[in-house]
Amino acid sequence: GGSATGYLMNAVEPDVIEERVAEIETTIGPIEVALFNLGAQIGDRPLADTSYKQFEMGWRLATFGLFRVASAVLPKMEERGHGTLIVTSATAAVRGNKGQHSHAAAMGGRRMLCQSLNAEFGPKGIHVAHVLIDGAVDAPDTLGKLLGPERFEQLRSTMGREHDGLMLPEKIADTYVHVANQHRSVWTHEMDLRAFSDTAWWNHG
């Protein structure tokens, strides 16, 4: 049981992230666990079709957005001596595929930023975890919109549901809860998640 509150924001606008963090800390209470789950996928584009604006947008969402959240949240956690920041990432953080110039650069930056944040704040009692989502997630609002209703439903019928070939958001959430509750003597910094039937990113030819 419990309650939840949602907010809409444009994460590339100045001050909106910082103001929302301050509001939550004041009106709801101290942030014990922060989850950064902002995507930055603009699709497959050859270099010639990737504009400066599109490339920068990936960085603003994936890397600079995390920097802003960390800058707003981690100092408060440091004052309290504990806290957790879990960062959702993608295979692009460790492998740059053709046509993924913006996404790979942005996610690679996200991963390195997580390592830097962990080096600074881990010894201060703050758990920073970087989670690679190495596969397709059964999410109508993201993958469904990317593929379109017909292709998404076809994918669900062949790989999802009882086939367990698409990652279920609620099972990802279970894993995040586990990470958030880890004892500090056994903290996970980086982990990767995928369906049992998927080939791990390092085994792709």
Task: Describe the predicted segments one by one.
Residues 2-3, 30-31, 77-90, 123-126:
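Active-site loop of short-chain dehydrogenase/reductase
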Residues 2-5, 23-36, 42-43, 187:
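A glycine-rich helix->loop->beta "capping" turn
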Residues 8-20, 52:
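The beta1-alpha1 cofactor-binding region of Rossmann-like NAD(H)/NADP(H)-dependent oxidoreductases
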Residues 18, 39-56, 99:
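Conserved mid-core segment of classical short-chain dehydrogenase/reductases
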Residues 48-67, 86, 110:
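Catalytic Tyr-X3-Lys loop
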Residues 61-79:
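Amphipathic alpha-helical dimer-interface segment in Rossmann-like NAD(P)H-dependent oxidoreductases
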Residues 84-109, 115, 119-122, 137:
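Catalytic loop of short-chain dehydrogenase/reductase
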Residues 123-126, 130-134, 149-205:
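C-terminal helical subdomain
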